[in-house]
Curated annotation (Swiss-Prot):
GO molecular function: metal ion binding; peptide deformylase activity
Native source species: Vibrio vulnificus (strain CMCP6)
Residues at the catalytic site: 134
General function of this protein: Removes the formyl group from the N-terminal Met of newly synthesized proteins. Requires at least a dipeptide for an efficient rate of reaction. N-terminal L-methionine is a prerequisite for activity but the enzyme has broad specificity at other positions.
Top-level EC class as recorded in UniProt: hydrolase
Enzyme Commission no: 3.5.1.88
Similarity-based family: Belongs to the polypeptide deformylase family.
High-level lineage: Bacteria, Pseudomonadati, Pseudomonadota, Gammaproteobacteria, Vibrionales
UniProt keyword annotation of Membrane present: no
Alphabetically ordered keywords of this record: Hydrolase, Iron, Metal-binding, Protein biosynthesis
GO biological process: co-translational protein modification; translation
Catalytic activity: N-terminal N-formyl-L-methionyl-[peptide] + H2O = N-terminal L-methionyl-[peptide] + formate
Binding site residues for Fe cation: 91, 133, 137
Protein name, per record: Peptide deformylase 1
Length: 170
């Protein structure tokens, strides 16, 4: 397994709409394993393939406290949304930024697991929010897209400043 590079906003590759996985192969399973390792290495609770410049419909999530219960969703599709919720979200592709995003409180999602078996999942609370956040990535959408243009610009400017600082430190 290997750690993949996470793209950061405003990288245009984050806007790419992911294509469905045609067949779960050993290559796809390696991508899944690398994504899980990357998610843990970056201390995230979710990661979409788009974030690591792989434009296929693959998501990994682990909201467990023990950080050893990874969930794999290949070709995920939300079948139903219920209620309203929202928490202050962050994102590995938008480091250091957080914002309140309106989301459904509960979702029903259909997907394939790491072995290509179809399953349906009823999710609520943090898991429901995380699923919606990661599936947005597969559509080329980021949580900052829910913000006002001014807030989005402030975040973009802050990230550019951090990037310039880091480049000077090298």
């Amino acid at each position: 397994m290997s750690v993949l590079q996470v793209l950061t906003f405003p990288d245009d590759r984050l806007r790419t709409v992911a294509k469905p996985v045609e067949k779960v192969t050993p290559e796809i399973q390696k991508i899944v394993d690398d994504m899980i390792e990357t998610m843990y290495d970056e201390e995230g609770i979710g990661l979409a393939a788009t974030q690591v410049d792989i434009h296929q419909r693959i998501v990994v999530i682990d909201i467990s406290e023990s950080r050893n219960e990874p969930m794999v969703l290949i070709n995920p599709e939300i079948l139903e949304k219920r209620g309203e919720d929202g928490i202050e979200e962050g994102c590995l592709s938008v480091p250091g930024a957080r914002a309140l995003v309106p989301r459904a409180a509960e979702v029903t999602v259909k997907a394939l697991d790491r072995d290509g078996h179809e399953f349906t999942l009823e999710a609520d609370d943090l898991l429901a929010i995380c699923i919606q956040h990661e599936l947005d990535h597969l559509q080329g959408k980021l949580f900052v897209d829910y913000l006002s243009p001014l807030k989005r610009k402030r975040i973009q400017d802050k990230l550019a400043k951090i990037k310039r600082f880091n480049e000077k430190q090298r």
